[in-house]
Amino acid sequence: MKDFNDKVAYITGGSSGIGLATAKALSTEGAHVIIFARKKDCLEHALEEIKSKRISSSQRFSCMTMDVSNWDEVQEVMFRAVAQFGVPDVLINCAGRAYPRVFEEINYEQFDETMKINFHGIWHTTSALVPYMKERGGYIVNVSSIAGFIGLFGYTDYSASKFAIIGFSEALRSELKRYGITVSVLCPPDTDTPGFHEENKTKPEETKAISGSAKLMQPDEVARALLAGMRKEARHIIPSFDGKLIFLLKRLLPGLVEFVMDSTIKKVQAKRGEK
C-alpha cells in the first residue's frame, strides 16, 4: 500500500503504545482512523492525540470500546463500525498483553487469557472483517514480536501466542492474495510503552538479562518502520537491526543463538548460587 491518504484504518489496542503511535502516524498521512480498546477513558484521551496530527479537516476519527478476546462482542462492535465508518482499507491488530514469569508459576487461567487476548483476539477481528474486506481488497497487519520467532525465558505463554500469530499471518497472506488483501506481520523488539513497564514488574532476572542486551525502541520508531514495511508489502516487518539479525541467525545458526542465550541465563543463575 503506497498511499494511506483517505484510507479507513481500524486499529485494535489503539489507545496506547505501538497502536497509538501507529494511529498518529496514519493521521499524519491523511487516513481516517478508528481505534478500539477496552478502556473508554484511555480511548478518548488517545483520540485527541490522534486528531491533533490530522492534515485535513475532512479526516474522520472515532473510538469504540471492545474486548478482542470476546468473540460475540467483536462481531457486534465490528458490525457497528462498518455500518458507521465503512469497510476498513487497513486493519492493524495491535491489542496484546504480556505478564512474564517462569512456566511453573503460570496457571491455566493466565495462559488462557494470554492466548485469548494475543492470538484469539487477532482471529476474532480478522474473521469479523475479512468478509467485508475481500470485496475490494485491503491490508491486514498482525502484531507479533521478536518473541514470536525465538522462544524466550520467562515468556512460555507469550511466545506461544506470538509464534501462533506468525504462523497464522503467513498462512492468511497466502489465502487472501486472491482477494487483493495483503497480510504482514510486525515483529517489534522491546518497546518503551506502558505495557513494557508493567512487564518489568514481574520479569525474571534471566529475562531482563536477555532483553537488556538489545536496544529499547520508541513507539513512534516502530510505527514509522511499520508504515515503511507496508509500503513495500513486506511479509515480515522487523523494525530493529537486532531483531533482523536474530531472525536471520535463528534460521541459519539456531545452535549459536541457543548457546548465547543459555550462557546469559547461566550467568544470572550462577549469581544466585544455582548450579
Predicted regions mapped to residue ranges:
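Active-site helix of classical SDR
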Residues: 126, 161
